[in-house]
Curated annotation (Swiss-Prot):
Superkingdom: Archaea
Protein name (Swiss-Prot/TrEMBL): Succinate--CoA ligase [ADP-forming] subunit beta
InterPro entries attached to this UniProt entry: ATP-grasp (IPR011761), ATP-grasp_succ-CoA_synth-type (IPR013650), ATP_grasp_subdomain_1 (IPR013815), Succ-CoA_synthase_bsu_CS (IPR017866), SUCC_ACL_C (IPR005811), Succ_CoA_ligase-like_bsu (IPR005809), Succinyl-CoA_synth-like (IPR016102)
Residue positions binding substrate: 254, 311-313
Subunit structure: Heterotetramer of two alpha and two beta subunits.
Length: 376
């Protein structure tokens, strides 16, 4: 789950990390009060749960009140990477001398936390790694030991810091690592972490929290709800594992492995999955009906591919759920099905009587789904 910048900065401030003074606004006209409180110049920052706002035009500098109001109106009218701008963080502009980069994330290959730092902040780390890989300092951290003070200092030296700035960097690094641990984070990032007249200041602060750990942080539950689309909320109410993607072929499977394999096969044959939807084991007809309805409501979905391997899940229940959804919905979309396992013959009979195409292999079903999507 991506926290909005103002939410992440509230956590940073609570832990003592220096950040710019800021005011959150939810309407353009509120920028006037923010300017009066903060003084000029100010930076207006769109609050959306994605990286790369600057390049997308979501961060603006205002030097006078009229410009601040004009830019606020412009930003509130924007949609950034698919997210409408519902709030702005207005901050007092800092006198920046140099921009650094500092983050903690998970190295899944080596199963460790890794600290990343660079003397070249402001760029997205993926771009920096591609263009100047030697500019990034990487420090693997043993989870049972944590980040040691001398390790943080050594990283600071390698990105050119010394004296008071080095001591401050050590403190900020150790604090960011503590936040990373305390909040079950997948990413804690300051980009840029700037050298200013008052020392190091986290001009931007990002946090991604593991969705599976949200139950340990009930104060973040509202943030998670905000990040979900209406269809994702509907799926969550049924207990589905549902993630929206950019394609046009709806995917329904039972079990994460089979569902991901289905997505892979669709990709292999030139299609693009519109989602991941795992109905889980033992799904009854009402759950299957609800899953199909979610994809029928998704305007991006042109065709639905249902791939079920029945163990404790009865193929007959799956088939009846599909038929129920199609018969009760005003939205009509082609469905391709492959169902095998428990109550397979009964399930196939139900689908054949409903005129739903059935396939024996996943490959054949995927190819048909791709063909239908391209023809739609």
């Amino acid at each position: 789950m991506n926290l909005l910048e103002y939410e992440a900065k509230a956590i940073a401030k609570k832990y003592g990390i220096p950040t710019p003074e800021g005011v959150l606004i939810e309407r353009p006209e509120q920028v006037n009060e923010a300017v009066e409180k903060l003084g000029l110049p100010v930076v207006l920052k769109a609050q959306v749960p994605v990286a790369g706002r600057g390049k997308a035009g979501g961060v603006k500098l205002a030097r006078d009140p009229d410009e601040a109001l004009e830019l606020a109106e412009e930003l509130f009218s924007k949609e950034i990477k698919g997210f409408p701008v519902l709030s702005l963080l207005v901050e007092k502009a800092e006198n920046i001398q140099k921009e650094l980069y500092l983050s903690f994330t998970i190295d899944r290959t080596n199963r460790k936390v890794v600290m990343l730092a660079s003397a070249e902040g402001g760029m997205e780390i993926e771009e920096l790694a591609k263009e100047k890989p030697d500019a990034i300092v990487k420090l693997p951290i043993e989870p049972e030991v944590g980040l040691k003070a001398h390790e943080a200092r050594e990283v600071g030296k390698r990105i050119g810091l010394s004296g008071q700035l080095l001591r401050q960097f050590e403190g900020i690094a150790k604090t960011m690592y503590k936040i990373f641990e305390d909040y079950d984070a997948e990413l804690v990032e300051s980009n840029p972490l700037a050298i200013t007249d008052r020392g190091l200041v986290a001009l931007d602060f990002r946090m991604i929290v593991d969705d599976n750990a949200i139950f340990r942080h009930p104060e973040l539950e509202a943030s998670r709800e905000r990040e979900l689309s209406e269809l994702e909320k509907e799926a969550a109410r049924w207990g589905f594992f549902y993630v929206e993607l950019d394609g046009d072929i709806g995917i329904i499977g039972n079990g994460a492995g089979l569902t991901m394999a289905t997505m892979d096969v669709v990709n292999y044959y030139g299609g693009r999955p519109a989602n991941f939807l795992d109905i889980g084991g033992g799904a009854r007809r009402d759950r299957v009906k609800a899953a199909v309805n979610v994809l029928l409501k998704n305007p991006k979905v042109k065709v639905i591919f249902v791939n079920i391997f029945g163990g404790i899940t009865l193929a007959s229940e799956v088939a009846q759920g599909i038929v129920d959804a199609l018969s009760e919905s005003n939205v009509k979309k082609p469905i391709v099905a492959r169902i095998v396992g428990t109550a397979e013959e009964e399930g196939k009979k139900i689908l054949k009587e409903a005129g739903i195409p059935l396939f024996e292999s996943m490959d054949e079903a995927a190819q048909e789904a791709v063909k239908l999507a391209k023809a739609a």
